[in-house]
Curated annotation (Swiss-Prot):
This is Toxin NaTx-22. PROSITE patterns: LCN_CSAB. Keywords: Disulfide bond, Ion channel impairing toxin, Neurotoxin, Secreted, Toxin, Voltage-gated sodium channel impairing toxin. GO terms for biological process: defense response. The keyword Disulfide bond applies. Belongs to the long (4 C-C) scorpion toxin superfamily. Sodium channel inhibitor family. Pfam families: Toxin_3 (PF00537). Gene3D superfamilies: Knottin, scorpion toxin-like.
Amino acid sequence: KDGYPVIKTTGCKLICVGISDNKSCDRFCKKQGGSHGYCHAFGCWCEGLSGSTPTYPIPGKTCKK
């Protein structure tokens, strides 16, 4: 599946700023089991995640920074 994987401790998506963060988003997504990732709308968007990977927003859970 595709989406914004969440940081497990906060329930938030990983924030990024523009194409300069594409490499860090790609690394983050691959660590989450995705095929690749990039910065999109100020968050790391991942493609190819497993169906069990939680993505933002998580129903009933808010982002706590």
